[in-house]
UniProtKB/Swiss-Prot annotation:
It is found in: Cytoplasm. Mg(2+) 1 binds at residues 297, 311. SUPFAM superfamilies: Glutathione synthetase ATP-binding domain-like, PreATP-grasp domain. This is D-alanine--D-alanine ligase.
């Protein structure tokens, strides 16, 4: 049987460009293991910081280096052209994190190309990327979550007459400490923990540099636990894992620096709580109409034995430090089998004519 060509898409214009490269390198390694080389021919496609797609030869150099390489100046018109090898792809494996990668825009392009691809479609990707939209869906689905307030960049940068009133509104609804986040960035980019009015104002200004939609969440004393989901209409949940860290919160540096945080799989929590988290993870996955892959993050409030959903990530990281592949490893699905299953779920999710 002829091997199927899988296009590995990585890089992109977002602040998570470097994380995407590391994830792609790990995925490429998994495709070279077990019987995957007999089933798939992997072709990498690197999208540079200018949004230009590069052919497999240059893309492989980026994968090998594990970081962005200086590339020759390309005609700007080529930004709208696919590399010659692109039309031959049977299925795409996008691992472009952040805006224009996991927010439905790239998924829309792949849909127009009429090719199967790993992960959620436009709806699930868009709702899963925007934390405000996500929380509205969670609320509609009856999923318990922390209190929050949505803010627009225009309110933050409105001047001395309006901005203080915005902060007053936030303080009236939430107690310190709070977390201020851009609504559409992952990997903890642009997030601040605030304890005072002055810190709140500065954090809002910082978050507004990254996004026009912001979210302020109430702080909660809880353990951070995560559950991976795999599948389409009958998704399965992995064992539950826990993230432990010594820093004030799980920021970008803590997340991607060796020794800054540790994973505990399975999490040392009561069996009934673990089962509840698995059920809630699947419920969240289905509420957003996710496909193939997602990681769902929760707060486990030990004092009250309650579980609050934090967020869903429809395109979680695949680096050596990433929770998603490790959760499945501990659930009996090694990395090479995981990428194989994801491609198979993508192939089966093609509408029948």
């Amino acid at each position: 049987m002829a091997r199927q060509r899988v296009g590995l898409l990585f890089g992109g214009k977002s602040g998570e460009h470097d994380v995407s490269i590391v994830s792609a390198a790990a995925i490429a390694k998994a495709f070279a293991q077990e019987d995957n080389p007999d089933k798939y021919e992997l072709l990498p496609f690197y999208i540079d910081r200018n949004g230009i797609w590069h052919d497999p030869e240059i893309s492989q150099q980026v994968l090998t280096a594990g970081k962005a390489l200086p590339v020759e100046t390309v005609d700007p018109a080529s930004r709208w052209q696919f590399p010659p090898a692109a039309p031959s792809i049977d299925a795409w494996f996008p691992i472009v994190h952040g805006p224009n990668g996991e927010d439905g825009t790239l998924q829309g392009l792949l849909t127009l190309m009429e090719k199967p691809f790993v992960g959620s479609k436009v709806l699930g990707s868009a709702a899963g990327m925007d934390k405000l939209a996500m929380k509205m869906v969670f609320a509609q689905a009856g999923l318990a979550q922390v209190d929050y307030v949505g803010v627009l960049r225009s309110e933050v940068w409105s001047g001395p007459c309006v901005f203080p009133k915005v902060c007053d509104k936030i303080e009236a609804q939430l107690d310190y400490p709070m977390f201020v986040k851009p609504a559409n960035l992952g990997s903890s980019v642009g997030i601040s923990k605030v304890r005072t009015r002055d810190e709140l104002e500065k954090a809002l200004d910082l978050a507004a540099e990254y996004d026009r939609r912001l979210i302020v969440e109430a702080g909660v004393t809880a353990r951070e636990v995560e559950c991976a989901v795999l599948g389409n209409d009958q998704p399965k949940a992995s064992v539950v894992g826990e993230i432990r860290f010594d820093s004030d919160f799980y920021d970008y540096e803590t997340k991607y620096t060796d020794g800054k945080s540790s994973m505990h799989i399975p999490a040392e929590i009561p069996g009934a709580i673990a089962q509840q988290i698995q059920e809630l993870a699947i419920k969240a996955f289905q509420a957003l109409d996710c496909r193939g892959i997602a990681r769902v993050d929760f707060f486990y409030v030990e004092a009250t034995q309650t579980v609050l959903i934090n967020e869903i990530n429809t395109l979680p990281g695949f680096t050596a430090l990433s929770m998603y592949p490790q959760l499945w490893q501990q659930s009996g699905v090694p990395f090479p089998q995981l990428v194989d299953r994801l491609v198979q779920f993508a192939l089966e999710d093609v509408p029948q004519a």
